[in-house]
């Protein structure tokens, strides 16, 4: 890394394990400065509950970034709307969560931060606060005015991107259009090159239907839509293999010769990845004008403040963001 960079972290739902995990991140040195967008009392109280040392340093955007030392975090303060009891949701704090996301996103857009790492949010309490919220991915897409974003989850061994994300099954076939596939594959290919440092990405593409349509006998989306798009993109030089049946694609003879898998919908690709690496996975938003990674788990309200939460996914998300920063320099 040419110079020390700043990354911004949002702990997510304040009543969940996000603050616990951020405090745990502070228990080691990092080659980047960790700027946490959060309420100061929330972090110090949670550190006290966990019995872990924590010193909060004020965020100074005009000072050079410094590597984070053990037991410290840099604080970008955002005030809670209501006091927090670990494990108990408070509707007004839905506004607080969105404020942290907005400030962190804006800081990435204006060049303050080299990457954003997000902790788990509780979508229900945000919506209960009368804030329409589908998820981090859609929020950052809208706020950054990105043309299109792609959700990808990754472990050390496997990367799975999604052509569609949070759609009912009955709507997916209609959503898989040539325009969508062109856009999604272009973003996936571009970010594998620029953010992951893969010169010629090799992408496996799932079919939509069982057995990838069985030659048109179990659906024609492969013949009508997916195959023509893949043929066009191969002619442009992309290394694409598919459409392949999703039930046989996830095995070494295919995965050993690929850099990523493109699944057509959420529950086609993610169960395999989460079974293979749950707790070690990272959610990456491709297509944003900045680097964004996230944990692959939820708020685990029942574990908040108990010292039982596994920080592994957050560490993996932060380490991956650091690697991506290096690749883009």
From Swiss-Prot:
Superkingdom to which the source organism belongs = Bacteria
The UniProt family comment states: Belongs to the PdxA family.
* Name this protein carries in UniProt: 4-hydroxythreonine-4-phosphate dehydrogenase
Gene behind this chain? pdxA
Biochemical pathway: Cofactor biosynthesis; pyridoxine 5'-phosphate biosynthesis; pyridoxine 5'-phosphate from D-erythrose 4-phosphate: step 4/5
Note from the entry: The active site is located at the dimer interface.
Report residues binding a divalent metal cation. 166, 211, 266
Per the UniProt record, which EC number(s) apply here? 1.1.1.262
As for subcellular location, the record says: Cytoplasm
NCBIfam families in the cross-refs: pdxA
Q: Which organism is it from?
A: Shigella flexneri
Is-annotated flag, keyword RNA-binding? Answer: no
Subunit details? Homodimer.
> What is written in the cofactor note of this entry?
Binds 1 divalent metal cation per subunit. Can use ions such as Zn(2+), Mg(2+) or Co(2+).
Q: What is the lineage of its organism?
A: Bacteria, Pseudomonadati, Pseudomonadota, Gammaproteobacteria, Enterobacterales
């Amino acid at each position: 890394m040419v110079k020390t960079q700043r990354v911004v972290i949002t702990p997510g739902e304040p009543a969940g394990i996000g603050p616990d995990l951020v405090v745990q991140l502070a228990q080691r040195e990092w080659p980047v400065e960790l700027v946490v967008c959060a309420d100061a009392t929330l972090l110090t109280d949670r550190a006290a509950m966990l019995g872990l040392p924590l010193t909060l340093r004020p965020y100074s955007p005009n000072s050079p970034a410094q590597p984070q030392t053990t037991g410290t975090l840099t604080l970008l303060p955002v005030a809670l709307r209501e006091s927090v009891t670990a494990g108990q949701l408070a509707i007004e704090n839905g506004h607080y969560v969105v404020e942290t996301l907005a400030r962190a996103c804006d800081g990435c857009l204006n060049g303050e931060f080299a990457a954003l790492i997000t902790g788990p949010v509780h979508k229900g309490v945000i919506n209960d606060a009368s804030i329409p919220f589908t998820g981090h991915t859609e929020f950052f897409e809208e706020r950054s005015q990105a043309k299109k974003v792609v959700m990808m989850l990754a472990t050390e061994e496997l990367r799975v991107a999604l052509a569609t994300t949070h759609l009912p099954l009955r709507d997916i076939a209609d959503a898989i259009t040539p325009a969508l596939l062109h856009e999604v594959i272009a973003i996936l290919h571009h970010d594998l090159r620029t953010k992951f440092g893969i010169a010629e990405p090799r992408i496996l593409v799932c079919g939509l239907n069982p057995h990838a349509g069985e030659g048109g006998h179990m659906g024609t989306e492969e013949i009508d839509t997916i195959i023509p798009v893949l043929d066009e993109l191969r002619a442009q030089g992309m290394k694409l293999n598919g459409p392949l049946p999703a039930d046989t694609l996830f095995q070494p003879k295919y995965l050993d010769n690929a850099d990523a898998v493109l699944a057509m919908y959420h529950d086609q690709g993610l169960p395999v990845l989460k079974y293979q690496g749950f707790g070690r996975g990272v959610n990456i938003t491709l297509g944003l004008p900045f680097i964004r990674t996230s944990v692959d788990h939820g708020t685990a309200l029942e574990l908040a403040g108990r010292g039982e939460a596994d920080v592994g996914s957050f560490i993996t998300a932060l380490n991956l963001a650091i690697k991506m920063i290096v690749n883009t320099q």
